[in-house]
Amino acid sequence: MQKGIKYAAFIFALILIFSPSATAIDHRELSEGEVGIISQNCSSIKVRLQRVQKDDARNRVFLGSQYETIASKLMLNLNLRLVKNGMASASLAEQQTTFMSERDRFKNDFIGYSQEFENLLNMNCKDEPEKFYRQLEVVRAKRADVDASMQRLKSIISLHYESVTDLRNNL
């Protein structure tokens, strides 16, 4: 059981270290010069956005698999072992439930973000730069939702790590 706890601690630490962060930018009106810049640089803007989309998809796959590993192989297995050994912990079980709910929220937030991002990439920024920018703001807000969910997952992982460490120290 000690080996499993050490493995769980290691995975938790990795997630905390490597979770990417995203931020939203506040809405503002575009000047005529900015509208012109978007129009003139539309193709290079789209190339950069496609790169961001590809990186985000790769990060989503990585984080999704790590979150799944934490939920199913670490939290669930630990709680099952604790119950089997007569040492059930209500706080660890609650953390598992909260983590799984937040993981589902992360998935849904990311799907919404991806859909809005795809809508952005399908827009004509050369002919409709203001509309393109408004959609970019929608994408930023959706990305902020994804980031907030990731931060909540990080907090749950940190709390669970502390609980597992306390459990280990009390054995």
At which residue positions do the language-model features occur?
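Bacterial N-terminal signal peptides that target proteins for export
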Residues: M1-A8
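Bacterial N-terminal signal peptides
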Residues: A9-I17
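N-terminal signal peptide c-region/cleavage motif recognized by signal peptidases
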Residues: S19-S21
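C-terminal amphipathic alpha-helix
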Residues: H27-E68, N122-L171
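Amphipathic, heptad-repeat alpha-helical segments
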Residues: R60-R103
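Amphipathic, soluble alpha-helical interaction motifs
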Residues: K73, N77, D109-G112, E116, ...
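Long, amphipathic, charge-rich alpha-helical segments that form helical bundles/coiled-coils
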Residues: L92-V146
